[in-house]
Structure formats: structure tokens, C-alpha cells
Amino acid sequence: MFGKGGLGNLMKQAQQMQEKMQQMQEEIANLEVTGESGAGLVKITINGAHNCRRVEIDPSLLEDDKEMLEDLIAAAFNDAARRIEETQKEKMASVSNGMQLPPGFKMPF
């Protein structure tokens, strides 16, 4: 089924890929991305584990209505989460040699 040394090479490649993925997971967990809404009036920075690290609100918004500010905060967080997921996909694609992950697949970190 496997040629001479084929299984050994396959196992070695799998181990190398596992090490690269572990390294990439650590990189991504430490990565910080900022999402914005309201043309940059609200900014939220999250890390690769989707933990909120920082919230910045332009002072001019503090005088406006509460509902609009809440919507802008939610939109900024969603933008940051989308950016983290895109970055994760890009980084993991480089490790997996472009192997496409199934739709909806979430990385375990």
C-alpha cells in the first residue's frame, strides 16, 4: 500500500504539520485586531481568542443617543471578530499548504 519508507515519510510530514499548526495557534492567540464602526468613531480591539482587549469611543458619541452607541459598539466588535477569522484562515492556509477547511470549521482556539 505504501512504498518503501512511505508510511514513515507520511508520519513525519503529519508531525511537522502538527508542530506548525501548534505554533500558528500560539501566534494567532497573541494576535490583536481592531474592528471599527461609524467611520472609526468606535474601535474595539480583540485577540485571537476573541477576548476584548480595548474599547475606544470618540467623545462626540457620548452626547448622542444610547441606542446608537450600543449599535456601533456591537458593529465594531463584529468587524473585529470577522477580521480575526479572516486572519486565522489566511495563516492556517499557509500551514496546511492551501488545504481548504470545511465551511463553518472553527479553529480550536
From Swiss-Prot:
SUPFAM superfamilies per the UniProt record, alphabetical: YbaB-like (SSF82607)
This protein's record includes keyword Cytoplasm: yes
Main location: cytoplasm
Keywords noted in UniProt: Cytoplasm, DNA-binding
Residue ranges the record marks as coiled coil: none
A GO molecular function held by the record: DNA binding
Membrane-spanning ranges: none
Top-rank taxon, per record: Bacteria
Cellular-component GO terms for this entry: bacterial nucleoid; cytosol
UniProt keyword Nucleus present: no
UniProt function note: Binds to DNA and alters its conformation. May be involved in regulation of gene expression, nucleoid organization and DNA protection.
Family note: Belongs to the YbaB/EbfC family.
UniProt name for this protein: Nucleoid-associated protein PMI0140
